Amino acid sequence: MILLKFKKLKRYYHLYQQNNLFGELTLICAWGTFDSNRGGHKFIFCKNQLELYAQLAKISKIRLTRNYRLY
């Protein structure tokens, strides 16, 4: 499930929530450019929904200060 999408000219940053095979909450951060296949992702494992929302707030603040916009 996509939680937030950010974009900046030719770049994007997406945040997904997903449970892994062990039932743990996982926040998946994916980034890259619109015009190529280059990019990456990382997994942040959260103990509960509250921790996941705290991570979302932290990442959103960073993205917005770097001139990304929500879409």
How would you name each of these model-derived features?
Residues Y12:
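Double-stranded DNA-binding cores of transcription factors and transposases
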Residues Y16-K42:
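Short aromatic-glycine-(Arg/Gly/Cys) micro-motifs in beta-strand/loop hairpins
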Residues M1-K8, N37-R38, Q49:
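Negatively charged, low-complexity tracts enriched in Asp/Glu with abundant Ser/Thr
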Residues T65-Y71:
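Boundary/linker segments flanking structured domains
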